[in-house]
Amino acid sequence: MAKQKIRIRLKAYEHRILDQSADKIVETAKRTGATISGPIPLPTERTLYTVIRSPHKYKDSREQFEMRTHKRLIDIVNPTPKTVDSLMKLDLPSGVDIEIKL
């Protein structure tokens, strides 16, 4: 029988909230008896926006804004039914995007 694996990808703009969420997931999975690999930090995605400061002219005067998206990857190997139930009931902050693949 093939091993089951749950892959969880977390994305957030704030790395502190992201790390807290990853710690909650890892602690919950370990408490229920699953094997964990991670959290693995993935490359930070950086989006840069350049805008002209004035509304009409002075094109040489520009301002740059950036948005950083931090990512983490957690693999849960051989999850028990108890692990899946406890992960479904877990409350995480609203600024974290979660992608789960079975």
UniProtKB/Swiss-Prot annotation:
Superkingdom of origin: Bacteria
Gene name linked to the record: rpsJ
Keywords per UniProt: Ribonucleoprotein, Ribosomal protein
Signal peptide: none
UniProt lineage: Bacteria, Bacillati, Bacillota, Bacilli, Lactobacillales
Membership in a protein family: Belongs to the universal ribosomal protein uS10 family.
Organism, as annotated: Ligilactobacillus salivarius (strain UCC118) (Lactobacillus salivarius)
UniProt xrefs under Pfam families: Ribosomal_S10
Quaternary structure (record): Part of the 30S ribosomal subunit.
Transmembrane portions of the chain: none
Protein name: Small ribosomal subunit protein uS10
